[in-house]
Amino acid sequence: MRHLTSLKELSKNEILELLDLADNFIDSEGSIRRDPLFPDKKVVNIFCEPSTRTKISFEIAASNLGCQIIDFDLSSSSLEKGETLKDTIDNLAKMNINLCVLRHKDSVIHELIDQTDSMVFVSGGEGSISHPSQGLLDIMTVRHRKDLDNSNILIVGDLDHSRVFQSFIDGMSNFDSKITLCGPKELCKDV
């Protein structure tokens, strides 16, 4: 796995390997430990939609891994002057950015991946399609409390427009748990 764009693309073993890797960064007291494994890597977070928790979580994670975090302020970028996202990514790749975390209202990440092979992409959320990092976090939360293969899980809410719900379902489809869905009819038409 080179990019993380959707949990649909991951096998059960790949998900478990990612969760095991994440668990290795939690110390015996439950705190996240710093381990500067990548001091020569540059990470840019491009968030074309508002975000607090996801954006800051990725910044903290990159910092904990020793990465150089490139501040990308959408409002002062050339995107505001009409530059395309493809051109922005092309320029960042030429600046030797190693990893791009992208949040966008549309499904554009695969087009950008096809454009450059020098940068790794992680989806920080795409429209109502996917949010793989949040899906992995939710699966990890279940795993810390229950067996992923033998749980009963109830999901309540707006299931038609939730990228988090979709990613959780995509990831959990690899496991043998019973998932029950619930919500107002007008918010669960597509389920």
Question: Can you annotate each of these PLM segments?
Answer:
Residues 10-13, 38, 49, 53, ...:
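Conserved active-site and cofactor/substrate-binding residues in soluble primary-metabolism enzymes
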Residues 41-45, 67-70, 98-99, 119-122, ...:
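Structural motif
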Residues 42-95, 99:
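Active-site cofactor/substrate anionic-group-binding motifs, chiefly glycine-
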Residues 48-60, 143-191:
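Glycine-rich phosphate/diphosphate-binding loop of Rossmann-like nucleotide-binding domains
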Residues 89-93, 97-171:
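Anion-binding alpha/beta catalytic cores of soluble intermediary-metabolism enzymes, centered on
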